[in-house]
Amino acid sequence: PFNPNITDTQRARQTQLGQNMARWFDRFGTAYFTREIFDAFYPGYGDMWPTLNGSIAMTFEQGSPRGLIYGRRDGTLLTYNEGVRNNVISSLATVETVARDKASYLTDYAAFRRSAIDQAARSDDRYVVMDLANARYEAESLARRLVSQGIAVQRVPAGSSQCRNTYAAGALVVDKAQPQGRLIKTLLDPSTPLPPEFIAEQESRRDRGLNHELYDTTAWSMPLMDGVSFEQCRRVDLSNAIPIAANDPIPAKVSGTGGFGYAVPWTDGGQARLVIAALDAGFVGKTTDTAFVQRGRTFPSGSVVFAAADNPETLGPELTRLATEIGAELLPMASSWVEDGPNFGSASFAAMKMPRVALAWDSGTSPTSAGNTRFVLEQELGIPVAPIRVSTLGRADLSLYDVVIIPDTFGGVVAQSRSADQLKAFVRDGGVLISFATAVSELASEDVGLLSTKLELATSDADPGAEEEGASAPGLNFGTAQDYEAHIENERARPEDIPGVLVRAVANTDHWLAAGYDSANAMVTGREIYRPLNASDGANVFRFADADDLLVSGYLWEENRLQLAYKPFVMAERHGDGVVIGFTQSPTTRAYLNGLNLLVANAVVLGPARMAQ
């Protein structure tokens, strides 16, 4: 499918470029294919970002011989020389086409950017207004990522009224009526619709038992992935707006010194970064699993208190410096008295330390999942990671770590590494074992038994019937085509593959692992749907919402929508002194689900503190 923000002119230019490449490929006898696998829908591709900026872009992909010569199954050969030649031909053919008509290509580029302004200026959703009251760090970070791409973002002051609402904490505003308006629309709109005729064809293919033709995700709205509250409207008040620069520091919220100590509200990824930086600097903090109120301010579950009595005299200046560098909120505490909730000597508070984290790496793990996870931990949260090769996991001294993470796998990592006994002992001794996506099924296998869940098969109308033995079977009459289809349906089939949608996950707010959340947006891909944990085995800390409220963005097959409802997103199961945490979908996919970074911190930072109680 094509992204609807690609213009007809751009598609015509792509065809023009392709036709000249085809002419040259024909001259050299080079076979090629187009349009069969890849799409032009998701904006994260190397050709889609320039396209949505007004360029004419496309991807050339050449099969690799994995060396100098590759023998195909049909007996023909693919050589390295051919690959080089084909890339040169396609590149020079592109240059030739544009050189013949360069003035009109430049004219088209200018027209694309002018029309983006005109189109947005007339739209009812011209302005995107992002609330700074919640997920402030994610909203501020998103604004800077947009500005770094040349998109203008403005800040409006606290108390201003926009889109008929008052923004007590202020807001960030993006006007789509700018040259990159189509890129803005693609990145920030809640959803980008698939062409109706394409959807109809995919549903028809599924009915015929064929695979769908979606290459990648159908959802990517950046505010939704970042957990940022936003709305769109036709008019806003920008009379007091201030433009944001890409290198502007995120404003910190720091005020005064505290005689008793300092509190860090556990509300977003920036707050987690501040706590982690403070722990890394050697300061001692305690986290609460129950909200408390001091001087009228509610500090949610997960919030951290750094008491002056537990720390050196540099506590105040250093925390202030870290909060300023990160752009976090730090509140001074004059005394330990609270109006509501637990006092700081309560068992609700757990002492924290800088977690020592190991990550399964290399053979058997998904390279992208392992890399995404390491990036989120090290670059987004500031937690060093020790990668452990799968081949040595069974021999590694896991007592050196507080947390072990198994990212998404291709299956068999635990068996391949012969690490089941090691992992069980690690958890029993107080460790936090975290698994993502397919790794959950490895820990749930009978051989490992660390998660009391199972993968589900697809829901089915098929009647398995009685076992039939011998060379013949009783006769059947099929009265309708539906009877026939039901009879041949594979009752052992897995759920339909989901290319990628954003769905709503509801939090069990009584559990420490849900600190900072009432709900979250999760990216769901693949076929894996798990059974919920029984209450006697553990907790379903996040479950997917009911079928009517499940889908946040993207296109989801109806069968999956019904089956995914109420199923677990995050599970926690205690064994001995430790805990096993299963994310049925990866929270670090592409390292762009910034709204889940706080949840990752819950598992990696709060988890060891809770297990040490």
What are the residue ranges of the model-derived segments?
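Intrinsic-disorder/low-complexity accessory segments
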Residues: 2-32, 36-42, 46-613
